[in-house]
Design a protein with these regions (language model features):
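Glycine-aromatic micro-motifs
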Residues: 1-144
Length: 144
């Protein structure tokens, strides 16, 4: 989601704007990185990117698709009231873990940069090791 990281990894990528993924929630996987998991009624906010073939290969390598760390899956996202098929990356390892040092700060900074809804940004910040990870607020879609 970070503009700076995407421009470094995928210089030909074009940001198409923010989008939502209904029926899924943000999680930190056992490896300490972000992923998504199905959850009826939940919603993930993020950024939709148009990638060149070279950028797609670069992001697949970065997400360790060939090694099996993440699985690439097409899901329907919503952007501006319209549905669109998008490639997502889902951690192979199920369950929840603790984020790696600095990871959540990076995610939250990017969420602020993209002006994602503040309740959602707060739900991301709760994943910080010092943050509270109990029941999430209903308005974030995390409570299920």
């Amino acid at each position: 989601m970070s503009r700076a990281l995407m421009s470094g990894r995928c210089p030909g990528a074009e940001a198409l704007g923010t989008a939502t993924l209904p029926g899924w929630r943000f999680v930190i996987n056992p490896e300490g990185f972000g992923s998504i998991a199905p959850r009826p009624g939940a919603r993930v906010y993020g950024v939709l990117w148009r990638l060149t073939a070279r950028d797609l290969a670069a992001i697949n390598a970065y997400e360790s698709v060939d090694a099996g760390l993440y699985l690439r899956r097409r899901l329907m996202v919503r952007q501006g009231g319209r549905g669109s098929s998008a490639i997502t990356y889902i951690a192979r390892w199920k369950g929840e873990g603790t984020p790696r040092p600095g990871y959540i700060a990076l995610v939250v900074d990017a969420a602020h940069d993209w002006k994602l809804p503040e309740p959602y940004v707060r739900s991301l910040a709760r994943w910080a090791p010092s943050g509270w990870r109990g029941a999430r607020a209903r308005d974030t879609g995390e409570l299920g």
